[in-house]
Amino acid sequence: MASCCPTSRGAAASNKSYTFKGKEIENFGGLTTYVVGSTSNTRVLIGFMDIFGLSDQIKEGADKLADDGFTVYLPDFLEGKPLPVTALPPKTPEDQKLCNDFFSTRISPNLHWPKLAKVVEAVRANHGPNVTIGTYGFCWGAKVLVTYPATIDFVGIASCHPSFPDSADAANVHCPVLFLCSKDEDAKIIKEWEEAFKTNPAYAKSSFETFSDMFHGWMAARADLSNPEQRKRFDEGYQKVSSFFQSLM
């Protein structure tokens, strides 16, 4: 669990004053999905949640990316059963058991690859043969993306405060990557990942950056958007994701 969430922070309160620009649809590739943007768009991003599910923070982030010209899909890969925000960090034996069960049975990447493949199929069916697809993931979601067997389907993968980093995964990735790390990820392992990727032609269009003043989860459910500094860095993170995909599409 420490590798998944290398911080003692729990999820933050959502931004109650914000009005979402997208909508949730019941069945997109078999999953309830938050979508923002036009179905006629050929520039599509698929976001992969963290363990806290379809949080308000990642929906707001999707809206920011849509403002820059992308259509964004946030599928509920945890199918309505994320880890409760009150359970992490665990405060009771019941919380600890809930966390142990969740991490041991719910987050193996291979459980989620077939779901992602169906979402990719749905994107192609909705947006046509000329669509280009990028993906971005938070924490555990980033691990699912870089280990996905068909990364060649994507023009790029953005990994935001990635969990379970392993340099062996670099050999599986066949597109440019953006790593946006916090102070909580293991810098040595991230550097090993980058070094392993340097022989890949996609490295030339890749970037590895660290927000040394931010914590694991600052672009997702742990972001307190009422805090001016966290809001600033949240916005900067999404701008970097946007610029990365703008350069590839």
UniProtKB/Swiss-Prot annotation:
Keywords: Cytoplasm, Nucleus. GO terms for cellular component: cytosol; nucleus. One of its GO terms (molecular function) is hydrolase activity. Disulfide bonds: none annotated. Pfam families: DLH. The keyword Signal does not apply. Its main location: cytoplasm. It is found in: Cytoplasm; Nucleus. Belongs to the AIM2 family. This is Uncharacterized AIM2 family protein C30D10.14. It comes from Schizosaccharomyces pombe (strain 972 / ATCC 24843).
